[in-house]
Amino acid sequence: PVSFIFQYKEIFVDKIYIFNTDRKQPVIYDCGSNVGTSIVYFRKLYKNARIVGFEADKNIANICRSNLKNNNAENVEIIDKAVWINNDNIEFNEHGADGGSIHGSGNKKIVESIRLKEYLDNEPYIDFLKIDIEGAEYEVLLDCKDSLNNIENIFIEYHSWVNDSQKLSSILNILETNGFRYYLESLTKKDSPFLSKTTKSTMDLQVNIFGYRI
């Protein structure tokens, strides 16, 4: 599918997730693992890393596990629950191969959730935290805002939904408050932006945020 080709290009060709580390066993949290493309990449580069992946859609999580096995990317913990602000479950829209979201339309169902903050608080150091959770990133980051000091690198895929207020500045403020510098790349291309303020799409902006310490 097109989504996989895009994933592969971003991860293996553009190398958006590569980072430097001197640690023998870096810790990587992959929130929104999808079919496991990013984890295969992490395992290839950081052979001794401790990797924890989260994927809310149990069917996709099983595909992820199979892909990891087929690519010799083993010794990875995959948690098939949604990354959220509590452990009380959440309504989730399944979108097939593209994963799912708490926003938009799709096959709605209740899925199990975990509170990411609790995981972060139990880790003395995290080398890389990836958050690509299709629209839940603001709520999760807000809940984790006092638990980011032990993180060296953070990647966030920000999604702006037409029917909701934009939260990009709030996310950047959380990063600034926690001592991160950041770099942004927009994945949204609009011709004549002032003439295309309304959109039929449920999403009107998507930005990759790279947070790091120097």
Name each model-derived stretch.
Residues P1-I214:
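Phosphate/nucleotide-binding beta-alpha loop and adjacent structural elements of enzyme active sites
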